[in-house]
Swiss-Prot record:
Protein name: Androgen receptor
Domain notes: Composed of three domains: a modulating N-terminal domain, a DNA-binding domain and a C-terminal ligand-binding domain. In the presence of bound steroid the ligand-binding domain interacts with the N-terminal modulating domain, and thereby activates AR transcription factor activity. Agonist binding is required for dimerization and binding to target DNA. The transcription factor activity of the complex formed by ligand-activated AR and DNA is modulated by interactions with coactivator and corepressor proteins.
Region (Disordered): 35-164, 192-225
Entry GO MF terms: androgen binding; beta-catenin binding; DNA-binding transcription factor activity; estrogen response element binding; nuclear receptor activity; steroid binding; transcription cis-regulatory region binding; zinc ion binding
Organism: Pan troglodytes
Database matches in InterPro entries: Andrgn_rcpt, NHR-like_dom_sf, Nucl_hrmn_rcpt_lig-bd, Nuclear_hormone_rcpt_NR3, Znf_hrmn_rcpt, Znf_NHR/GATA
Location of the region described as Interaction with HIPK3 in the Swiss-Prot/TrEMBL record: 563-653
Chain segments carrying region Interaction with CCAR1: 583-910
Residue segments, region Interaction with LPXN: 543-910
Residues in cross-link Glycyl lysine isopeptide (Lys-Gly) (interchain with G-Cter in SUMO): K385, K512
Other facts: In the absence of ligand, steroid hormone receptors are thought to be weakly associated with nuclear components; hormone binding greatly increases receptor affinity. The hormone-receptor complex appears to recognize discrete DNA sequences upstream of transcriptional start sites. Transcriptional activity is enhanced by binding to RANBP9.
Gene this protein is translated from: AR
Protein family: Belongs to the nuclear hormone receptor family. NR3 subfamily.
DNA-binding residues (ranges): 551-623
């Protein structure tokens, strides 16, 4: 109660003059109810003033009314005949009776009884407490009869408040607002339970006192035995506080004898078995009071250590158990475990420390390391990543500095063994990753027990045995005989062990910064690109969606390959007129004029000079002329006599040297080579099967657009029939992408991972996660062949162009003759590129054999990928993998022809 401070003394302020808020009036009414309990069986009043004097007057009136009603009941019972009483007892309703605010039966709204009902008999052995009126009737030998309820007095009061009379007597004298609030706040259910418990306890204690002869006070009978007014007041205050959303920290502590309810949200913390569902009201106050109670045998230090969000939280992060000493069962549990149904009441940091302390999402089983331990149980917060060092023994601890894209392909451990590698124990091989099969382990698994210092294998078809047959029909260099990835061409000089960093783009430490001199001649938008920095060349939007190929002369959009260079139509016509004409052009400046789309007509001299620098010649209008020129020279050499044989050889050598000095064909291939394409994969999201495969399909869609543009710019390709052009591209796109990806993996990451795109690099973990591990291993082995054979960029460009013409339908194309001629011309160009670097014919033949064997090895890999993509397209809806429209059309229409045998590849060697 609020007080006023006077000059020299403290005196209470009159309640009638006190100004309070809504909640202050509520609790003031509750306090007045507690201080003035009222009669034993009060009746509900419509309203009560806050003053104490008015409450006393109203209570006296209620007592007088109650006495009058009791007298009327006795008179009616005397007038009622025994036969009518028996009939009323037989016709009584069997349902459970509820007491109203004046002791009447409270019936449901749907039931309208036509006659009064008799109350059920009260049995003391069942724990029932008879009503006072019933006790009077029993003493006189009359059956108990309940009067009919009044019509108007009690109709305004809520029906649920009728249950509060026997247990909380002071509630009847409170205001009507309090009753409405308690009814709306769902506090009645809790008070009903407490009423039943109080009645049962009161009956048992009353019987014990009667047996011992001890007198029973009116206060004990009134509150049900051992309960007191202060205890009931505390329960009511706490129930109202919780139901109104107020804090319960300021309430009084529970007595040491009170027990903790099992349906409390804190009950599992203290070892109490939880109930089916926690109640929202008073149990929280009871549990809170019991947790804050300082009982005997519990120190202050233990009580201070309870709070799970303060001191215990720090200990939980350090790996210690969160102790809770709020009850006697706290010492036995010793661990703070919150139930899963109460996730809204707990902090995420409580279980993250214990769940993530020994968990690493990147301790995945790699192909060249020992078998990992069983994975930890799943966690609801599995999307959170913790990049801790790998902790799988000696072979795994060596990769502690590896990042997310780390690969253990270069680690050499004596105990590392993969499936099918002859591990000493069967348990080691059985605990290998589930995606490994027996065939995959033998064909593509890591080499177990390689010679020298290597236990790591190449992951390809070659095993670790000395007498293994080379799959490509040739002998690899001595440093690659053991199948070790990191042994060829001294990769550590330019490829450190850091692999690819965690950022979605490769870091400068893992990318070969020099592309070679073969890209210097192409000054297009992507020809002078250097992968020295990670984000300089990938952030612009035109990198993800590259524009059309530009003219090498003026930078305008190119219309095709003209006179040996990729140019626009304007520069094509200008070069033809300027080269064939006899007019000489002179520059008015210093021969360094800017030639672009808007200023290309300002200086014809600089424009013509730039055309020659790009490799444009009148003799390169058609690729046939070069072949015909060589055949003509060979025919002339064969028809001449022996004295002129030396002269013919000199002409042939001079022709080859001139061709090497002006590589028209290579200039075209270098100019039309597609740039780097990104997949748009979000590396910040967790790796999943659907995400990886959807990104691969999106990358295939983007690369397919570049393949079409690249094929149309190839010399001689437009001379094919239009249907033949479409068919060749649709049949060979998979092999072209695999071959180009193998080259990128060799040049960027030294064939240790699959470099699909700068933002989509597959390490061992992603290979397993994508469920195409065997195909990925074969593609990685293809990439390793570029290093073992030391493929030059010129050889790669020519082999890639030849790969376009390496698969046709069984029935043939519409213009099969011209297709065969075009394919033969590209084969001759590959032979010329080989002959430019080698003088010995035997060496040239061996090199040609190796390169053609490598081309043949692409076809089986492409067929496996065709089968995989076709099966994935059928199940795409079930596995949530997205397919772009063009990719889905090609896979659904053209791939079945390849799988059914209607379209077959052209092999150089017998398979």
């Amino acid at each position: 109660m609020e007080v006023q401070l006077g000059l020299g003394r403290v005196y209470p302020r009159p309640p009638s003059k006190t100004y309070r808020g809504a909640f202050q009036n509520l609790f003031q009414s509750v306090r007045e109810v507690i201080q003035n309990p009222g009669p034993r069986h009060p009746e509900a009043a419509s309203a009560a003033p806050p003053g104490a004097s008015l409450l006393l007057q109203q209570q006296q009136q209620q007592q007088q009314q109650q006495q009058q009603q009791q007298q009327q009941q006795q008179q009616q019972q005397q007038e009622t005949s025994p036969r009518q009483q028996q009939q009323q007892g037989e016709d009584g309703s069997p349902q459970a009776h509820r007491r109203g605010p004046t002791g009447y039966l409270v019936l449901d709204e749907e039931q309208q009884p036509s006659q009064p009902q008799s109350a059920p008999e009260c049995h003391p052995e069942r724990g029932c407490v008879p009503e006072p009126g019933a006790a009077v009737a029993a003493s006189k030998g009359l059956p108990q009869q309940l009067p009919a309820p009044p019509d108007e007095d009690d109709s305004a009061a809520p029906s649920t408040l009728s249950l509060l009379g026997p247990t909380f007597p002071g509630l009847s004298s409170c205001s009507a607002d309090l009753k409405d609030i308690l009814s709306e706040a769902s506090t009645m259910q809790l008070l009903q339970q407490q009423q039943q418990e109080a009645v049962s306890e009161g009956s048992s204690s009353g019987r014990a006192r009667e047996a011992s002869g001890a007198p029973t006070s009116s206060k004990d009978n009134y509150l049900g035995g051992t309960s007191t007014i202060s205890d009931s007041a505390k329960e009511l205050c706490k129930a109202v506080s919780v139901s109104m959303g107020l804090g319960v920290e300021a309430l009084e502590h529970l007595s040491p004898g009170e027990q903790l309810r099992g349906d409390c949200m804190y009950a599992p913390l203290l070892g109490v078995p939880p109930a089916v569902r926690p109640t929202p009201c008073a149990p929280l106050a009871e549990c809170k009071g019991s947790l804050l109670d300082d009982s005997a045998g519990k120190s202050t230090e233990d009580t201070a250590e309870y709070s799970p969000f303060k001191g215990g939280y720090t200990k939980g992060l350090e790996g210690e158990s969160l102790g809770c000493s709020g009850s006697a069962a706290a010492g036995s549990s010793g661990t703070l475990e919150l139930p899963s149904t109460l996730s809204l009441y707990k902090s995420g940091a409580l279980d993250e420390a214990a769940a993530y302390q020994s968990r690493d999402y990147y301790n995945f089983p790699l192909a060249l390391a020992g078998p990992p331990p069983p994975p930890p149980p799943p966690h609801p917060h599995a999307r959170i990543k913790l990049e801790n060092p790998l902790d799988y023994g000696s072979a795994w601890a060596a990769a502690a500095a590896q990042c997310r894209y780390g690969d253990l392909a270069s680690l050499h451990g004596a105990g590392a063994a993969g499936p099918g590698s002859g591990s000493p124990s069967a348990a080691a091989s059985s605990s290998w990753h589930t995606l490994f099969t027996a065939e995959e382990g033998q064909l593509y698994g890591p080499c177990g027990g390689g010679g020298g210092g290597g236990g790591g294998g190449g992951g390809g078809g070659g095993g670790g045995e000395a007498g293994a047959v080379a799959p490509y029909g040739y002998t690899r260099p001595p440093q690659g005989l053991a199948g070790q990835e990191g042994d060829f061409t001294a990769p550590d000089v330019w490829y450190p062990g850091g692999m690819v960093s965690r950022v979605p783009y490769p870091s400068p430490t893992c990318v070969k910064s020099e592309m070679g001199p073969w890209m210097d001649s192409y000054s297009g938008p992507y020809g002078d690109m250097r992968l020295e920095t990670a984000r300089d060349h990938v952030l612009p939007i035109d990198y993800y969606f590259p524009p059309q190929k530009t003219c090498l002369i003026c930078g305008d959009e190119a219309s095709g390959c003209h006179y040996g260079a990729l140019t626009c139509g304007s520069c094509k016509v200008f070069f033809k007129r300027a080269a064939e004409g006899k007019q000489k052009y002179l520059c008015a400046s210093r021969n360094d004029c800017t030639i672009d789309k808007f200023r290309r007509k300002n200086c014809p001299s600089c424009r013509l000079r730039k055309c020659y620098e790009a490799g444009m010649t009148l003799g390169a209008r058609k690729l046939k002329k070069l072949g015909n020129l060589k055949l003509q020279e060979e025919g002339e050499a064969s028809s001449t006599t022996s004295p002129t044989e030396e002269t013919t050889q000199k002409l042939t050598v001079s022709h080859i040297e001139g061709y090497e000095c002006q590589p028209i064909f290579l200039n075209v291939l270098e100019a039309i080579e597609p740039g780097v394409v990104c997949a748009g994969h979000d590396n910040n999201q967790p790796d999943s099967f659907a995400a990886l495969l959807s990104s691969l399909n999106e990358l295939g869609e983007r690369q397919l657009v570049h393949v079409v543009k690249w094929a149309k710019a190839l010399p001689g390709f437009r001379n094919l029939h239009v249907d033949d052009q479409m068919a060749v591209i649709q049949y060979s796109w998979m092999g072209l992408m695999v071959f180009a990806m193998g080259w990128r993996s060799f040049t960027n990451v030294n064939s240790r991972m699959l470099y699909f795109a700068p933002d989509l690099v597959f390490n061992e973990y992603r290979m397993h996660k994508s469920r195409m591990y065997s195909q990925c291993v074969r593609m990685r082995h293809l990439s390793q062949e570029f290093g073992w054979l030391q493929i030059t960029p010129q050889e790669f460009l020519c082999m890639k162009a030849l790969l376009l013409f390496s698969i046709i339908p069984v029935d043939g194309l519409k213009n099969q003759k011209f297709f065969d001629e075009l394919r033969m011309n590209y084969i001759k160009e590959l032979d010329r590129i080989i002959a430019c670097k080698r003088k010995n014919p035997t060496s040239c033949s061996r090199r040609f054999y190796q390169l053609t064997k490598l081309l043949d090895s692409v076809q089986p890999i492409a067929r496996e990928l065709h089968q995989f993509t076709f099966d994935l397209l059928i199940k795409s809806h079930m596995v949530s993998v997205d397919f772009p429209e063009m990719m889905a059309e090609i896979i659904s229409v053209q791939v079945p022809k390849i799988l059914s045998g209607k379209v077959k590849p052209i092999y150089f060697h017998t398979q």
